[in-house]
Amino acid sequence: MTQKNLCLYFQIHQPTRLRLYRFFDIGKDSHYYDDFTNRTILKRVADLCYLPMNKLLLELINQHKGAFKVAFSISGSALEQFERYAPEVIDSFRKLADTGCAEFLCETYYHSLASLASEPEFKHQVLKHKAAIEHYFGVTPVTFRNTELIYSDNIGAQVYDMGFHTMLTEGAKHILAWRSPDFVYSDDRQTRLKLLLRNYSLSDDIAFRFSDRSWAEWPLTAEKYLGWLKNDINTSAGDVINLFMDYETFGEHQNAASGIFDFMKYLPETILNDGTFRFSTPSEVAKACKPVSSLEVPEPISWADEERDVTAWLGNELQQEAYNKLYAQYEKLALVNDPALYNDFGHLQESDHFYYMCTKFFSDGEVHKYFNPYDTPYEAFINYMNVLSDFIIRVDEEYSATVAKFATSENQETEKKKPAKKAEPAENKKTKTTLASEKTVKAAKKSAGKAVKPEAAKEKKNSKPAVKKAVKKKSE
């Protein structure tokens, strides 16, 4: 019997949370981030999830001598916070990378919605994230996953053009219809791009329902879960089961007391001893399995909420106004050379800021609410727009300075390119000077014979050039 593939993928992201930024801070203070909260949460999640889970996975990889494999995607925002507040977390991920049994995926550096807004900015962030993964872990990512598994035909084509041949996304019902997520598919426009689809039911059994005591299947054991995996793959006759989830599931969303670490400790052994499945990384799945058909996805899908679309971030007027106003700054920023501004632009793109403004209720809303620093979506919107207002002032100032500098430089270049005047013979100069002097003398003699009225002289003496008043435009 041919073994089926089991692909475990974990998302790691920590947003750069904004501090309380009041209206009166606009134009006065350009530090936008709540460093204390970011540090506190990062340190806590590192102790509860990242460090113990990485330690467990390393033990499992060594125990099973390479038969157990996983995949990670770590946002650039999370990497920055690891380096700043918990460098030991990066070291623990490096140890996993060194085993060769952990694949590191590429995504948008800032865990942003750039793929929906700006193709150049999307590409910039992907390349920046790729460079970061190479820097921290010494590997070049070959598989792509977009922020929150957002995908469409258009995004898939862009991803392929950037050199990726495998991409992860959601196994959304309204896209698959009667088909199963347990197969590899291809992009509708670029058939060479292979798509791995999340099995959301089996993924959510661990990510959301594991510690729910009201759940009819509680408690979930490794043996019971293996039975579900086998039943699913036998029913679908598929090639792979993709289990994609937040890494914070382990120890943070589902605390240690729930038994989540014990479950994970025994799951690989239970699965490998059975022999039905082998653990595979996304790139290994793509290499081993051929696409059964293409998927047509004209509108973006994601792994968020029941709709599996992007309304979690762009579903109301608050979110749309903030999103449009932010990305309207891109063209100006593309012309200035200010790393600090561009860094702030990146962090303001983080999808979390828009999620905090969401006014819907989701099946996974409680998880996100746990990390939400705001009591209401309206507070999130007001605070974000205050920050954005200050940011736009800085962008406009830098843009104006850049344009002025460019104009000055261009004028100087134009003057340099003008042909130099020919030197005139001394005799000509002398003749011109003499003629000018003669004209001056004649004019003086002519005016000497005319009387000047005292009033006219006084008026002429007291006259001053007109001065236009500069009207300072009030900033909005």
Where are these regions (language model features)?
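Short, well-structured secondary-structure segments
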Residues: 3-10, 16-118, 142-145, 165-170, ...
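Short, charged, surface-exposed secondary-structure boundary motifs
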Residues: 115-117, 175-183, 205-206, 289
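Acidic, His- and aromatic-enriched active-site or binding-groove loops in soluble protein domains
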Residues: 89-106, 127, 139, 160-197
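Intrinsically disordered, polybasic Lys/Arg-rich low-complexity tracts
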Residues: 412-476
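Active-site and substrate-binding clefts of carbohydrate-active enzymes
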Residues: 2-51, 62, 182-193, 197, ...
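Generic structural signal for well-ordered alpha-helices
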Residues: 54-58, 90-94, 123-133, 156, ...
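An acidic- and aromatic-residue-enriched active-site/binding cleft used to recognize and process polar
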Residues: 11-15, 75-77, 109-112, 138, ...
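CE4/NodB-like, metal-dependent polysaccharide N-deacetylase domain
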Residues: 121-148, 229-244
